[in-house]
Amino acid sequence: MNCINNLLVISALALPLMVNAQKATVGLSADGGKLNYKVSYNGKTPVPASPLGMKVDNICLGTDIASFSKNPGAETSYTVKRKDGAVYYVDVREFDDGVALRYRIPADGPKCIYSEQTAVTFPEGTRVWYASGPFQYGWIQAYQDRDISKIDNELLAPPATFLLPDGTYAAVTEANLRNFHGAVLFGNNDNSVNFGYVENKGHVESGTITGMPGSHVHDVVRDYPWIAYPDEKTGEIVTPWRVIMLASDLDGLVNNTIIGKVADAPDPELFPNGKDTEWIKPGRSVFTWLTEGNNRLSVANHKRYVDGAAELGLQSVVVDDGWELWPQTEPEGSAHTKWEYLKDLTDYAAQRGVDIWVWRPSSVRAGNKTDIGLVDAGERRQFMKKCAETGVKGLKIDFFHTENLFTVNLMEEILKEAARNKLMVIFHGVNKPTGDNFTYPNLLAKEAVRGLECVGGENSWAPGPAWTYHNTVLPFTRWLAGPADYTPL
């Protein structure tokens, strides 16, 4: 059975159901036994009839629908009942600047999630700005723009931004990604993009990442469970929100607020004051990674960077990969532990009003016997407790390169433990933001962007656009998802 042709059905009737909103409305209909939705905005239809659906336990949920009903309440939710008695829900949220939809499947034993058929269709002549590449690195590729009809089975890293023929702007992404695998977009060669999942199986072989140069062997994470979909889940299944941002101009687009509105609120035990937590202090930083050759990681050189940051009025210095080897690389060698060297640096920086952040990989890299990583819960607790005691203010955690279920949950555990120790976090080598910085205000940024770290050396594999084009596109594409760990020079 072709799942794409058997989409989630709410009604056997082709009768549209409208949800009221000030500017954006979602209309649901079941035309020909298939669930469709459309979006109206400012008297226009930027998203004409588009399919919804999921494939769970190898069954397209849209078949054999017995009934559906709209549930009472402030938020719109539809209950869908199958003839076999199975029940699931479609939730709809509407805002002045767009819409969001998601699926909920009640707990009923283990379930395997195979695929998703949620699509967003645009009028003919729509142009799209997007980044595309191997899925581990799709978030740091160069942006390009094309007519949407020319994109056929090509991966688009969310968010992708669209300019419709009538001048309306739209952006498509996902939000509130928690305990679920992340999604990408695929072009369908038919004026639409489809939410979908990328299989992890087969992307790790002989210490290399498929499609990537051998110089990136060290980026392969060996103790991640690199699994292929379907993902098996127990308990209630709640998908992330599928978000469509809408605006009549670019100013409205960059000021879109949907992601923050659908993100879960912070845990009051971890963040009693929410986003106003006193120890969370965003700022500008310097780091030595690109410019200092073999001397870049020494304690003395970092003190020089602290002096420079203080002189320039910058808030922090990031101590990158290699600091944990200081007992082997510093002139005094093993006379001091890595923590003693680090304490010397944090004390020096504190006297000058500069914070110190430290780097660590999320897990053990292939062929690197010095890595420890943060997968083990005990190691996470010990490492972060020691960082806090040493005076470190923030962590740069690197090398995720996937958004499977394990990795998404690992990032959340890292953020929780960091919050317990009053540590700020940036994620590097990671997927796009989905509102996680609203749920965890100590997450200041995620990379998921092609910065000037990719200009040469070991990063020269990333093909480069004209930087003037790339930088002017970013505020209207990648930055719509959330703050970025971006490297300018």
Listing of model-derived features with the role each one plays in the protein:
Residues 234-312, 316:
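An acidic-aromatic substrate-binding cleft motif
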Residues 1-23:
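Bacterial Sec-dependent N-terminal signal peptides
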Residues 23-265:
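N-terminal accessory beta-strand-rich subdomains and adjacent acidic, glycine-rich linkers
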Residues 91, 235, 278, 294-298, ...:
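Catalytic cores of large soluble enzymes that bind and process phosphate-bearing ligands
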Residues 89, 229-232, 274, 305, ...:
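Generic recognition of flexible, low-complexity loop/linker segments
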Residues 95, 99-101, 120-122, 241-246, ...:
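Long, contiguous hydrophobic alpha-helical segments, chiefly transmembrane helices and signal peptides
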Residues 319-489:
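Aromatic- and carboxylate-enriched substrate-binding clefts and catalytic-loop regions
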Residues 4, 116, 256-260, 302, ...:
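Composition- and surface-driven signal marking solvent-exposed, interaction-prone regions
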